[in-house]
Amino acid sequence: MSSVINVLFVVLVFVPSIYSAPPPNLTKDYYQKTCPDFNKIVRETVTPKQGQQPTTAAGTLRLFFHDCFMEGCDASVLIATNSFNKAERDDDLNESLPGDAFDIVTRIKTALELSCPGVVSCADILAQATRDLVTMVGGPFYEVKLGRKDGFESKAHKVKGNLPLANQSVPDMLSIFKKNGFTLKELVALSGGHTIGFSHCKEFSNRIFPKVDPELNAKFAGVLKDLCKNFETNKTMAAFLDPVTPGKFDNMYFKNLKRGLGLLASDHILFKDPSTRPFVELYANNQTAFFEDFARAMEKLGRVGVKGEKDGEVRRRCDHFNKLNV
Protein backbone atom coordinates (compact mmCIF):
# COMPACT_ATOMS: atom_id res chain seq x y z
CA MET A 1 0.00 0.00 0.00
CA SER A 2 2.84 2.35 0.80
CA SER A 3 4.04 2.25 -2.81
CA VAL A 4 0.64 3.52 -3.87
CA ILE A 5 0.59 6.26 -1.26
CA ASN A 6 4.08 7.38 -2.28
CA VAL A 7 2.94 8.42 -5.73
CA LEU A 8 3.29 12.18 -5.99
CA PHE A 9 1.21 14.53 -8.02
CA VAL A 10 2.55 17.85 -9.15
CA VAL A 11 -0.78 19.54 -9.59
CA LEU A 12 -3.23 21.87 -8.83
CA VAL A 13 -8.43 19.28 -6.55
CA PHE A 14 -14.32 19.45 -2.49
CA VAL A 15 -19.08 25.28 -3.01
CA PRO A 16 -22.26 27.51 -2.30
CA SER A 17 -25.81 28.71 -2.95
CA ILE A 18 -29.37 28.30 -1.88
CA TYR A 19 -30.99 25.17 -3.29
CA SER A 20 -33.76 25.86 -5.73
CA ALA A 21 -36.00 23.74 -7.89
CA PRO A 22 -34.97 23.32 -11.52
CA PRO A 23 -36.57 25.71 -13.96
CA PRO A 24 -39.21 24.20 -16.26
CA ASN A 25 -36.80 23.94 -19.20
CA LEU A 26 -34.24 21.76 -17.40
CA THR A 27 -34.67 18.52 -19.33
CA LYS A 28 -32.68 15.50 -20.43
CA ASP A 29 -33.12 16.28 -24.15
CA TYR A 30 -32.69 20.06 -23.95
CA TYR A 31 -30.20 20.14 -26.86
CA GLN A 32 -31.83 17.46 -29.00
CA LYS A 33 -32.79 19.92 -31.74
CA THR A 34 -30.31 22.77 -31.22
CA CYS A 35 -27.15 20.67 -30.69
CA PRO A 36 -27.94 17.01 -31.42
CA ASP A 37 -24.30 15.92 -31.11
CA PHE A 38 -23.89 17.38 -27.62
CA ASN A 39 -23.62 14.05 -25.79
CA LYS A 40 -21.31 12.59 -28.42
CA ILE A 41 -18.98 15.59 -28.42
CA VAL A 42 -18.69 15.61 -24.63
CA ARG A 43 -18.02 11.88 -24.49
CA GLU A 44 -15.46 11.95 -27.31
CA THR A 45 -13.63 14.84 -25.65
CA VAL A 46 -13.46 13.52 -22.08
CA THR A 47 -12.36 10.01 -23.06
CA PRO A 48 -8.88 10.83 -24.42
CA LYS A 49 -8.33 13.52 -21.79
CA GLN A 50 -8.96 11.07 -18.94
CA GLY A 51 -6.63 8.59 -20.61
CA GLN A 52 -3.87 11.17 -20.85
CA GLN A 53 -4.44 12.72 -17.40
CA PRO A 54 -6.00 10.18 -15.00
CA THR A 55 -6.64 12.86 -12.36
CA THR A 56 -9.10 14.66 -14.66
CA ALA A 57 -12.16 12.82 -13.32
CA ALA A 58 -11.45 13.67 -9.69
CA GLY A 59 -10.58 17.25 -10.53
CA THR A 60 -13.72 17.80 -12.58
CA LEU A 61 -15.93 16.31 -9.86
CA ARG A 62 -14.38 18.70 -7.36
CA LEU A 63 -14.75 21.65 -9.73
CA PHE A 64 -18.44 20.86 -10.22
CA PHE A 65 -19.03 20.65 -6.48
CA HIS A 66 -17.27 23.97 -5.89
CA ASP A 67 -19.30 25.60 -8.64
CA CYS A 68 -22.68 24.38 -7.43
CA PHE A 69 -22.11 25.19 -3.76
CA MET A 70 -21.09 28.73 -4.67
CA GLU A 71 -24.42 30.34 -5.62
CA GLY A 72 -25.52 27.50 -7.85
CA CYS A 73 -24.44 25.41 -10.83
CA ASP A 74 -23.81 28.41 -13.07
CA ALA A 75 -20.15 28.06 -14.13
CA SER A 76 -19.16 31.03 -11.96
CA VAL A 77 -16.08 29.13 -10.78
CA LEU A 78 -14.76 29.14 -14.37
CA ILE A 79 -14.58 32.94 -14.64
CA ALA A 80 -11.08 34.42 -14.77
CA THR A 81 -10.03 37.34 -12.62
CA ASN A 82 -9.56 40.68 -14.37
CA SER A 83 -8.41 44.14 -13.32
CA PHE A 84 -11.92 44.96 -12.11
CA ASN A 85 -12.83 41.78 -10.26
CA LYS A 86 -11.18 38.99 -8.28
CA ALA A 87 -13.14 35.89 -9.28
CA GLU A 88 -14.11 32.81 -7.26
CA ARG A 89 -11.38 30.61 -8.68
CA ASP A 90 -8.71 32.88 -7.17
CA ASP A 91 -10.01 32.70 -3.62
CA ASP A 92 -7.68 30.79 -1.29
CA LEU A 93 -10.18 27.93 -0.97
CA ASN A 94 -10.16 27.41 -4.73
CA GLU A 95 -6.45 27.86 -5.41
CA SER A 96 -5.86 24.10 -5.66
CA LEU A 97 -8.62 23.42 -8.18
CA PRO A 98 -6.81 21.42 -10.87
CA GLY A 99 -5.93 22.85 -14.23
CA ASP A 100 -7.01 19.66 -15.99
CA ALA A 101 -10.60 20.23 -14.86
CA PHE A 102 -10.68 23.73 -16.34
CA ASP A 103 -8.96 22.41 -19.45
CA ILE A 104 -11.54 19.72 -20.18
CA VAL A 105 -14.36 22.28 -20.01
CA THR A 106 -12.44 24.53 -22.42
CA ARG A 107 -11.84 21.66 -24.83
CA ILE A 108 -15.50 20.68 -24.85
CA LYS A 109 -16.65 24.27 -25.27
CA THR A 110 -14.30 24.74 -28.23
CA ALA A 111 -15.61 21.61 -29.93
CA LEU A 112 -19.24 22.56 -29.31
CA GLU A 113 -18.77 26.09 -30.62
CA LEU A 114 -17.63 24.58 -33.92
CA SER A 115 -20.67 22.31 -34.09
CA CYS A 116 -23.41 24.51 -32.61
CA PRO A 117 -22.11 27.98 -31.76
CA GLY A 118 -23.74 29.96 -28.98
CA VAL A 119 -26.03 27.14 -27.87
CA VAL A 120 -24.53 25.11 -25.00
CA SER A 121 -23.80 26.73 -21.64
CA CYS A 122 -20.58 26.18 -19.74
CA ALA A 123 -22.66 25.14 -16.73
CA ASP A 124 -24.19 22.27 -18.70
CA ILE A 125 -20.79 21.29 -20.07
CA LEU A 126 -19.37 20.99 -16.56
CA ALA A 127 -22.37 18.99 -15.32
CA GLN A 128 -22.30 16.53 -18.23
CA ALA A 129 -18.51 16.14 -18.24
CA THR A 130 -18.53 15.37 -14.52
CA ARG A 131 -21.07 12.57 -14.94
CA ASP A 132 -19.27 11.05 -17.91
CA LEU A 133 -15.90 11.13 -16.14
CA VAL A 134 -17.27 9.65 -12.92
CA THR A 135 -18.73 6.71 -14.84
CA MET A 136 -15.48 6.28 -16.78
CA VAL A 137 -13.59 5.52 -13.56
CA GLY A 138 -16.18 3.06 -12.29
CA GLY A 139 -18.73 5.32 -10.62
CA PRO A 140 -22.51 5.07 -10.94
CA PHE A 141 -24.45 6.45 -13.88
CA TYR A 142 -26.90 9.19 -12.99
CA GLU A 143 -29.18 11.41 -15.03
CA VAL A 144 -28.05 14.89 -16.00
CA LYS A 145 -30.83 17.27 -16.95
CA LEU A 146 -29.82 20.23 -19.09
CA GLY A 147 -30.79 23.81 -19.72
CA ARG A 148 -28.67 25.68 -17.15
CA LYS A 149 -27.51 29.14 -18.05
CA ASP A 150 -24.18 30.69 -17.07
CA GLY A 151 -24.27 33.17 -14.22
CA PHE A 152 -23.43 36.86 -14.31
CA GLU A 153 -21.35 37.02 -11.13
CA SER A 154 -18.16 35.51 -9.71
CA LYS A 155 -16.77 37.12 -6.56
CA ALA A 156 -13.87 35.71 -4.56
CA HIS A 157 -14.94 37.43 -1.36
CA LYS A 158 -18.21 35.46 -1.34
CA VAL A 159 -16.54 32.04 -1.24
CA LYS A 160 -15.67 31.92 2.46
CA GLY A 161 -18.31 30.12 4.49
CA ASN A 162 -19.79 28.35 1.49
CA LEU A 163 -17.31 25.52 1.07
CA PRO A 164 -16.49 22.72 3.53
CA LEU A 165 -12.98 22.86 4.97
CA ALA A 166 -10.40 20.13 5.50
CA ASN A 167 -10.56 20.38 9.30
CA GLN A 168 -14.24 21.07 9.92
CA SER A 169 -16.54 19.32 12.36
CA VAL A 170 -19.64 17.48 11.19
CA PRO A 171 -22.00 20.21 12.49
CA ASP A 172 -20.03 22.90 10.65
CA MET A 173 -20.02 20.93 7.41
CA LEU A 174 -23.69 20.11 7.78
CA SER A 175 -24.60 23.78 8.12
CA ILE A 176 -23.03 24.40 4.70
CA PHE A 177 -24.76 21.41 3.13
CA LYS A 178 -28.11 22.35 4.64
CA LYS A 179 -27.92 25.78 3.01
CA ASN A 180 -28.01 23.94 -0.28
CA GLY A 181 -30.79 21.55 0.69
CA PHE A 182 -28.75 18.48 1.60
CA THR A 183 -29.24 16.07 4.50
CA LEU A 184 -26.64 14.51 6.78
CA LYS A 185 -26.79 11.25 4.83
CA GLU A 186 -26.28 13.11 1.56
CA LEU A 187 -23.27 14.88 3.09
CA VAL A 188 -21.67 11.49 3.74
CA ALA A 189 -22.63 10.14 0.31
CA LEU A 190 -21.13 13.14 -1.49
CA SER A 191 -18.01 12.92 0.68
CA GLY A 192 -17.56 9.51 -0.93
CA GLY A 193 -16.36 11.41 -3.98
CA HIS A 194 -13.04 11.38 -2.13
CA THR A 195 -12.67 7.80 -3.33
CA ILE A 196 -10.83 9.44 -6.24
CA GLY A 197 -8.49 12.40 -6.16
CA PHE A 198 -5.84 13.82 -3.89
CA SER A 199 -5.15 16.59 -1.42
CA HIS A 200 -2.13 18.82 -0.96
CA CYS A 201 0.00 18.31 2.12
CA LYS A 202 -0.90 21.63 3.68
CA GLU A 203 -4.53 20.46 3.98
CA PHE A 204 -3.61 17.63 6.36
CA SER A 205 -0.22 18.74 7.73
CA ASN A 206 -1.75 19.42 11.15
CA ARG A 207 -2.40 15.68 11.45
CA ILE A 208 1.27 14.74 11.04
CA PHE A 209 3.27 17.80 12.18
CA PRO A 210 4.60 18.47 14.74
CA LYS A 211 2.98 15.41 16.29
CA VAL A 212 1.06 12.62 14.61
CA ASP A 213 -2.66 12.38 15.24
CA PRO A 214 -2.94 9.19 17.33
CA GLU A 215 -6.12 8.24 15.46
CA LEU A 216 -4.25 8.16 12.14
CA ASN A 217 -2.95 4.76 11.04
CA ALA A 218 0.71 4.70 12.18
CA LYS A 219 2.18 3.28 8.96
CA PHE A 220 0.09 5.64 6.87
CA ALA A 221 1.25 8.56 9.01
CA GLY A 222 4.87 7.56 8.49
CA VAL A 223 4.47 7.56 4.73
CA LEU A 224 2.71 10.94 4.83
CA LYS A 225 5.42 12.49 7.02
CA ASP A 226 8.09 11.42 4.55
CA LEU A 227 6.00 12.52 1.59
CA CYS A 228 5.25 15.95 3.02
CA LYS A 229 8.50 16.76 4.80
CA ASN A 230 9.20 19.67 2.45
CA PHE A 231 5.61 20.77 1.88
CA GLU A 232 6.22 24.33 3.08
CA THR A 233 8.71 24.92 0.27
CA ASN A 234 7.20 22.53 -2.29
CA LYS A 235 3.51 23.37 -2.20
CA THR A 236 2.62 20.98 -5.04
CA MET A 237 3.18 17.84 -2.96
CA ALA A 238 0.01 15.82 -2.49
CA ALA A 239 -1.34 12.45 -1.40
CA PHE A 240 -4.23 10.31 -2.56
CA LEU A 241 -7.45 10.69 -0.62
CA ASP A 242 -7.91 6.94 -1.10
CA PRO A 243 -4.44 5.36 -0.83
CA VAL A 244 -5.67 1.86 -1.69
CA THR A 245 -7.61 2.26 -4.97
CA PRO A 246 -6.99 5.93 -5.84
CA GLY A 247 -8.00 5.77 -9.49
CA LYS A 248 -11.15 3.71 -9.05
CA PHE A 249 -14.53 5.01 -7.98
CA ASP A 250 -15.65 2.51 -5.35
CA ASN A 251 -16.50 2.32 -1.65
CA MET A 252 -12.89 1.89 -0.50
CA TYR A 253 -12.90 5.44 0.90
CA PHE A 254 -15.38 4.35 3.57
CA LYS A 255 -13.48 1.14 4.32
CA ASN A 256 -10.35 3.24 4.76
CA LEU A 257 -12.04 5.49 7.31
CA LYS A 258 -12.60 2.47 9.56
CA ARG A 259 -8.87 1.63 9.39
CA GLY A 260 -7.54 5.08 10.25
CA LEU A 261 -6.72 5.84 6.62
CA GLY A 262 -8.84 8.95 6.26
CA LEU A 263 -6.48 11.61 4.95
CA LEU A 264 -8.24 14.81 5.98
CA ALA A 265 -9.52 15.54 9.47
CA SER A 266 -12.93 16.13 7.88
CA ASP A 267 -12.75 12.62 6.40
CA HIS A 268 -11.82 10.94 9.67
CA ILE A 269 -14.51 12.78 11.62
CA LEU A 270 -17.21 11.11 9.52
CA PHE A 271 -16.33 7.79 11.15
CA LYS A 272 -15.65 9.26 14.58
CA ASP A 273 -18.84 11.31 14.89
CA PRO A 274 -21.77 9.15 16.09
CA SER A 275 -24.21 10.97 13.81
CA THR A 276 -22.38 10.05 10.59
CA ARG A 277 -20.73 6.78 11.57
CA PRO A 278 -23.78 4.62 10.70
CA PHE A 279 -23.69 5.93 7.12
CA VAL A 280 -19.95 5.24 6.87
CA GLU A 281 -20.58 1.69 8.11
CA LEU A 282 -23.42 1.26 5.60
CA TYR A 283 -21.39 2.41 2.62
CA ALA A 284 -18.27 0.49 3.68
CA ASN A 285 -20.30 -2.72 3.77
CA ASN A 286 -22.57 -2.05 0.80
CA GLN A 287 -21.16 -0.43 -2.33
CA THR A 288 -24.53 -0.65 -4.09
CA ALA A 289 -26.13 1.48 -1.36
CA PHE A 290 -23.32 4.03 -1.69
CA PHE A 291 -23.63 4.19 -5.48
CA GLU A 292 -27.41 4.62 -5.32
CA ASP A 293 -27.22 7.40 -2.72
CA PHE A 294 -24.31 9.11 -4.44
CA ALA A 295 -26.16 9.10 -7.77
CA ARG A 296 -29.28 10.63 -6.22
CA ALA A 297 -27.21 13.25 -4.41
CA MET A 298 -25.38 14.18 -7.63
CA GLU A 299 -28.68 14.62 -9.49
CA LYS A 300 -29.78 16.89 -6.67
CA LEU A 301 -26.47 18.76 -6.68
CA GLY A 302 -26.93 19.52 -10.36
CA ARG A 303 -30.16 21.37 -9.55
CA VAL A 304 -28.71 23.71 -6.93
CA GLY A 305 -29.21 27.39 -7.76
CA VAL A 306 -29.76 26.79 -11.47
CA LYS A 307 -29.99 29.97 -13.56
CA GLY A 308 -32.57 30.42 -16.31
CA GLU A 309 -32.93 32.74 -19.29
CA LYS A 310 -33.66 35.81 -17.15
CA ASP A 311 -30.68 35.51 -14.81
CA GLY A 312 -28.13 33.82 -17.03
CA GLU A 313 -26.55 33.58 -20.47
CA VAL A 314 -24.68 31.19 -22.75
CA ARG A 315 -21.09 32.39 -22.58
CA ARG A 316 -19.02 32.52 -25.72
CA ARG A 317 -15.97 31.71 -23.58
CA CYS A 318 -16.32 29.88 -20.29
CA ASP A 319 -13.78 32.05 -18.49
CA HIS A 320 -15.34 35.39 -19.48
CA PHE A 321 -18.77 36.98 -19.23
CA ASN A 322 -20.20 38.02 -22.60
CA LYS A 323 -20.32 41.58 -21.28
CA LEU A 324 -17.83 43.09 -18.86
CA ASN A 325 -19.04 42.78 -15.28
CA VAL A 326 -17.35 44.56 -12.37
Swiss-Prot record:
Q: Which InterPro entries match?
A: Haem_peroxidase (IPR002016), Haem_peroxidase_sf (IPR010255), Peroxidase_pln (IPR000823), Peroxidases_AS (IPR019794), Peroxidases_heam-ligand_BS (IPR019793), Secretory_peroxidase (IPR033905)
Disulfide-bonded cysteine pairs: these are 35-116, 68-73, 122-318, 201-228
Q: What is its main location?
A: secreted
Q: Which residues does UniProt assign to the signal peptide?
A: 1-20
Q: Kindly identify the residues recorded as the active site.
A: 66
Give the transmembrane ranges.
none
Q: Where does Ca(2+) 2 bind?
A: 195, 242, 245, 250
Q: Which PROSITE patterns match?
A: PEROXIDASE_1 (PS00435), PEROXIDASE_2 (PS00436), PEROXIDASE_4 (PS50873)
The glycosylation sites are 25, 167, 234, 286
Where is the site described as Transition state stabilizer found in this chain?
62
Read off the SUPFAM superfamilies from this record: Heme-dependent peroxidases
- Relate the protein's function as given in its record: Removal of H(2)O(2), oxidation of toxic reductants, biosynthesis and degradation of lignin, suberization, auxin catabolism, response to environmental stresses such as wounding, pathogen attack and oxidative stress. These functions might be dependent on each isozyme/isoform in each plant tissue.
Query: What PANTHER family has UniProt attached to this entry?
Result: PEROXIDASE 41, PTHR31517
Similarity comment = Belongs to the peroxidase family. Classical plant (class III) peroxidase subfamily.
This protein is called Peroxidase 41
Supply the source organism for this entry: Arabidopsis thaliana (Mouse-ear cress)
Lineage, please?
Eukaryota, Viridiplantae, Streptophyta, Embryophyta, Tracheophyta
Q: Its encoding gene is what?
A: PER41
